[in-house]
Structures are given as C-alpha cells and as structure tokens.
Swiss-Prot record:
Protein family: Belongs to the eukaryotic ribosomal protein eS27 family.
Superkingdom as given in the UniProt entry: Eukaryota
Record bears the keyword Ribonucleoprotein: yes
GO molecular function: RNA binding; structural constituent of ribosome; zinc ion binding
The protein's name in its UniProt record: Small ribosomal subunit protein eS27
Species this chain originates from: Caenorhabditis elegans
Gene3D superfamilies: Zn-binding ribosomal proteins
A Gene Ontology biological process term: ribosomal small subunit assembly
Length: 83
C-alpha cells in the first residue's frame, strides 16, 4: 500500500510550516540579521526574536520593538538575514 505523501522528499511549503523538531532536517526558526538605521545608515546586528528594545548606536533611534515572538522592525529600517 503506497503512502499518499513522500516522506523523503517533502514539499518546501509543508516543511516550512512543520514544527522545527519534526522537520526532515531540524533547524531553528530564529536567525540573526543586519538592520540598517533609516536616520544615520549604520548597520547593527539584531536577533530575530529579540526580547528587549534595540536602539541605534549612532543616533539612538529605536530599530525594533519586542513582541511575544519575532521582534517588530520600525518603519523605514531595512534588514537582511545573516548566513
């Protein structure tokens, strides 16, 4: 009796929605990112699930606010994931 789903080659969308420990290859949902300030254009490294308010080193503007999950970036700030 064949399975309805291929367990060795899961669909990417299904793999993303799956719990981090039940994936084929386990990996966390969190990451570090470079955030560029919209005022002084300095780059700061921020954790994606930061639990404190992160301010810019150069101009003391707020870069991100903590939520119960991922940190919410301030409008105008751009970011990229670190590898």
């Amino acid at each position: 009796m064949p399975l309805a789903v291929d367990l060795l080659h899961p669909e990417p969308q299904r793999e993303i929605r799956c719990h981090k420990l039940k994936r084929l290859v386990q990996h966390p949902n969190s990451y570090f990112m470079d955030v560029k300030c919209s005022g002084c254009f300095k780059i700061s490294t921020v954790f994606s699930h930061a639990t404190t308010v992160v301010v810019c080193v150069g101009c003391n503007t707020v870069l991100c606010q903590p939520t119960r999950g991922k940190a919410k970036l301030t409008e105008g700030c751009s970011f990229r994931k670190k590898q």
